Amino acid sequence: MANAIVEKAKERMSHSHQNLAREFGAVRAGRANASLLDRISVEYYGVETPLNQIASITIPEARVLLVTPFDKSSLKDIERAINASDLGITPASDGSVIRLVIPALTEETRRDLAKEVKKIGENAKIAIRNIRRDAMDEAKKQEKAKEITEDELKTLEKDIQKVTDDAVKHIDEMTAHKEKELLEV
């Protein structure tokens, strides 16, 4: 039972890492990345549909995304959705494909994005600490209910803290890597 608490905490922390990676993927680093378009939904035959389900997204050059709709009639809808998004990229359509040229980042923009990355990383660490708190509370409840001994509680708390420390270290590494990527010229 005690191991289940640690395993559940590990699993929840793993989900936090995946969410962080997804959020970092949405922060543009001055080079083309298909994940920039992951959050864009297009109204396609009256239904909000993720862009990657109605078009192929390729990267022909370092700073260019090429969006090729499977159905050419959806080109205008895709263009409208990209314009409405908060990407800050203007789509250029030639009738069959949409080219998105990713502008080079200014030094100021890079610093702002690095601050945003730090904030996202800090929020992920807060989520990890909340998971630790929940796991510790669960362990204390079990000890109070006499399901585990006081010694087992101490061991469990150490295990939970080790898992938490590893998760926070991983978040710090991910954040540092993304910051480095952003600040490269």
From Swiss-Prot:
It is found in: Cytoplasm. InterPro entries: Ribosome_recyc_fac, Ribosome_recyc_fac_dom, RRF_sf. Pfam families: RRF. One of its GO terms (molecular function) is ribosomal large subunit binding. CDD domains: RRF. GO terms for biological process: translational termination. Keywords: Cytoplasm, Protein biosynthesis. GO terms for cellular component: cytoplasm. NCBIfam families: frr. Responsible for the release of ribosomes from messenger RNA at the termination of protein biosynthesis. May increase the efficiency of translation by recycling ribosomes from one round of translation to another. Belongs to the RRF family. PANTHER family: MITOCHONDRIAL RIBOSOME RECYCLING FACTOR PSEUDO 1, RIBOSOME RECYCLING FACTOR. This is Ribosome-recycling factor. It comes from Streptococcus gordonii (strain Challis / ATCC 35105 / BCRC 15272 / CH1 / DL1 / V288).
